[in-house]
């Protein structure tokens, strides 16, 4: 008869960002534990709040399934001595399995007999197996952990309670310094310690103590309450998904409410107000029906609506202090001169091993000028790039960015416009930080994109040059994100800038502040980001083939990978790749100094292939270019069927290899076809 299992771990307040991943991890680890221990179950449901992680298993078998295993031992000739008795080898084998020689039987495998024993293990009761479930809790991993009291162990937060129930029976076990029971804790202020009656009554028992254990239910409550406020007040609330996920992990019993602030603060840039509310106070932003910011906010209380007016006033007071700061900095920063702030950047360290921000900007300016030419920017855009590169970090020394560092670049754009800078320059100051996340927004202007590329390239080359190279998952300077940004920007704008040649040219530059080094490591790092950008849709062999192409032009490489993936599902892919692969492999033996001499052709197939290669222009999209190369497959096959490439005559051999080398030099601009797998 199946049962339901409940495990709840009661802890001190968890960081909000840890709650959801830990809830998921607990469920996955318990499922693995049960499967490995042969305890079948129907379903697993997880729960979490800031002060607990829990999981309930439904339909858990009351005992393990029986286990029958066959074990192969030594060959019969080794298992028996001269007298036909079991040898020490055979006796040791069965003893290691907990059996006797009576269990031995011989089975023939590939013409020879071997010792076999069959071991039967009866399943243990679930209750007995579950005594080891603390292994699941011990194996949990967290981004941070801590010691408490005089204990030698560490965990994400101090553990206060452990509840393990099999239906309504409490199992006795120990974890860290806690003995399990059926006592859980209610809401910190509204509830008390409570007894969990059974695994099935878990949610109801906690609800009576003002705890909503199901995170999804808490989220639905928050959204429903906000929607009610929208209708009652005739407003729109920005329900930011990330903020919602954070807030639901800050509360155990949510109650949403609306507060207000003086309309005078709306004169401060919207980004400042939104940052103050959303990032610093975890408030939802309120707008009118036209989408304009209103002097209101929505927050979520960890509790019921008792004395809610006092809660609203308290939250309003805290927010006003933030808004006062924003208003002050907005007013005072406008008195500053951009030139003065830029001059002071010589005293701001970019990194102690690399130098100042001013030096970083100087290098970026040189790189930006080179990129502007490569990207064929107009004269006006080139001028804007140069001006932006001279000043683009100035806002880091403003009071606003000092207080709200999330606004770097955003405030730079606003202050630049107020100072009379060209709009393209101001926009580039904001856009040079983009993308600021893996799937974040990209620059929309060419000027901003070039500045972003230049800034990221110098950052990458500078850190690599002083040996600060990411290893494993460790990337404290976000160089992977910066390089992924380089790849995404190049692809987005379709700039066909050969990265290998670009990086070579950057390493030829001379700066007093820094000498670029470790070029090979930089190129491998960029290749790894292009590889990642190709995505899971492209199999490993296709990614490797594209990465080994003769051109390192990001948009073309990504397009080639996509085209190869689509082509791999067609009928002519296998024969085309196989003929090209044969050509690639033979071409490796070609003498690079030998040019094709048509006078040495001995058959029509040589002439036909050479003419086809000469006519191969590889125009159009990556898919069209691939189609043009694949169209040569019959011609290549005819050539191989009628021509001895590795002829005894050295001149003929070299000439035929030269034909293939010409083919490969063109085809390899798409991919190294001999790296593709057709099996």
Curated annotation (Swiss-Prot):
Native source species: Streptococcus pyogenes serotype M18 (strain MGAS8232)
Classification of source organism: Bacteria, Bacillati, Bacillota, Bacilli, Lactobacillales
Any one GO BP annotation for this protein: arginyl-tRNA aminoacylation
PROSITE patterns found in the cross-reference section: AA_TRNA_LIGASE_II_GLYAB
EC number of this enzyme: 6.1.1.14
TM regions (residue ranges): none
Entry's Gene Ontology molecular function annotations: arginine-tRNA ligase activity; ATP binding; glycine-tRNA ligase activity
Keywords: Aminoacyl-tRNA synthetase, ATP-binding, Cytoplasm, Ligase, Nucleotide-binding, Protein biosynthesis
Cellular location(s): Cytoplasm
Similarity comment: family membership: Belongs to the class-II aminoacyl-tRNA synthetase family.
Subunit organization: Tetramer of two alpha and two beta subunits.
Protein name, UniProt field: Glycine--tRNA ligase beta subunit
A family per Pfam: DALR_1
Catalysed reactions, semicolon-separated: tRNA(Gly) + glycine + ATP = glycyl-tRNA(Gly) + AMP + diphosphate
Annotated GO CC locations: cytosol
InterPro entries linked: DALR_anticod-bd (IPR008909), Gly-tRNA-synth_bsu (IPR015944), Gly-tRNA-synth_heterodimer (IPR006194)
